[in-house]
Amino acid sequence: MTKLNLERTALVLVDMQNDFLHPEGAYGRNGQACDAIAQLPERLAPLAKAMRAAGGWIVSTHFTLVPSKKGAPFISPHLRSLRPFLGAGDFASGSFGHQLIDSLQPADLTVEKIAFSAFYQSRLEWVLSRAGLETLVFGGIVTNGGVASTVRDAHVRDFHNIVLSD
């Protein structure tokens, strides 16, 4: 088994945001909360704590809805059909809902994302490279969506990737 150089390793938390997970977030307010997903932060918290203690990094990627000049967010037709309850203020940069859930804070690096992959049209690759990170340990919600898309994009960028399971 290969030992990880934790100073070059990051726990990448995908979409672990209040709007997805907190009862007062967008999903909770609209009756879309999921008990299995709500339990995920408490399962990830010990790993995040251990990573910090061992000198590893915590990177948080945040799904972001960009508001139009009238305040309503730009939402793709596909997402609008799946999540018609999303509206102004949901997943807005700087808002309570956009933040990393308290039990996993603080993150060393935070990157906004507008698509499933956190690499798509974001600064993620740049900050990971500048931080000297080589190995990425992924955990988050919707493994077959944001997590898988980001892992695939990390792979083609030559990062060593580990996907957590429970």
Tell me what each language-model feature is.
Residues V147-R157:
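Short Gly/Thr/Asp-enriched flexible loops that form oxyanion-binding sites at enzyme active sites
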Residues D90-G140:
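Internal catalytic-core helix/loop-beta-alpha segment
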Residues V137-G140, D158-D166:
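A short glycine-rich beta-strand->turn/loop micro-motif centered on a GG-aromatic cluster
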Residues S122, N144, A148:
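Glycine-rich phosphate-binding loop at the start of an alpha helix
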Residues A53-G55, G132, D158:
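Glycine-centered short loops/turns at secondary-structure junctions
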Residues M51-R52, L128, A154:
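A generic structural signal for well-ordered alpha-helical segments
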Residues V12, V59-T61, L109-V111, V137, ...:
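Hydrophobic/aromatic beta-strand patches that form the interior of the parallel beta-sheet core
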Residues M1-P106:
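Active-site acidic carboxylates
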